[in-house]
Amino acid sequence: VNAPAFDQILRRLTEAEVKFVVVGGLALGAWGVVRGTKDVDIVVAPDAENLKRLAAVAEAIHGHVHAGESFLSSQLSIAGQLANGEQVAIETDLGRLDVVQGLDGVPSYDELKERSTETEILGIKVAVCSIDDLKAMKRAAGRTRDLADLEDLDATGQ
């Protein structure tokens, strides 16, 4: 497996006009907290057309989703998984893409988008969640790593 190419994932999503907001580790980086991340976390607009575009991008980079014992790799199957409104982790040739939805403490796409900032991540212009939304999601997740991230975010003084 090659090193993740998160810039390529972001570029493909942007070029396909997928409506998304970056959250998670890459958003931390955008707000000045440097830490490794093993996936691209995004919240997407939940309309069928947008999910179809996202699934097409996933299929093009050999994405597959684990569903119980099986794994699904067609655009239709991936779109179906996304339409369930639950979190979907898509393993691709370029790295892991985590579509965060249906989790406690994660605002809707519209809310996140409204408060987001346009910024460059890895040379790609994307919408990144606000620092307040990022802190709220980290608090809600509450894992040890998230609490450490919160301290680091506070230390940036933003």
Region locations from a protein language model:
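Compositionally biased terminal segments of proteins
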Residues: 1-158
